[in-house]
Amino acid sequence: MKRGMLVAALVVLASPLALLSAGGKGAVSGEYVEARTAEVFTGGCIMGSEAETVGKNAVLAWKVNQGSFNGVSLDGLTVVAAVAGDRNLGIGEIGGAKAATRSAVFVDSRANAAQQLALVAMATELSKGLVGNIVEVTPSAIEFADRGKEIHVAAGQVALDVSKEMSHDPTCGAMQWFHPLATVDQAAIGVAQQNAFSGSGLGAKWSDPNRRSAFFGTFAY
């Protein structure tokens, strides 16, 4: 019962009004990885056929190395968001209307209530509002492991494995079409060997492996 009340409180407190009134942001830095259900590096012929129909879903993950947000220390904590949109999440970059989104957020189960709220606020801010209309906030045991050549993330119903090595296939004039969905430094394109969400709260589930659909890098805010 207590856990259910905490989760409900976090969803309410994660509203834009509550996040805006939370005070100064502080300084925070760490590692970031994302993958969407569309290739970010592909040929024009493929993009032309997929732009309106794919890329509606994504997983975004932040691992804080050190720092605070809204005055709350987040050292060593992690937050993961699964996002479902009504259209390609990056379509605005190529002239389309911005997607309306719903988000399920997984906050580090080691965090206290104030830290969990700060993690949600940080994800909302660094994703430039993409992590919005939050329908679920779930405390979870989260794995975020940089294994050298790949990054592994697991949280609740989210599974993400990103290879840092990507071949630049010249087929069909391949090029980069999109940028990261969140604020990130030194962003590099990766291959999502696994990109899956199996939860029920977003009205969408996905599994979209083996695609050049990922970005990884660091963040500082």
Locate predicted features.
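Mature, soluble, non-transmembrane domains
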Residues: 102, 106-218
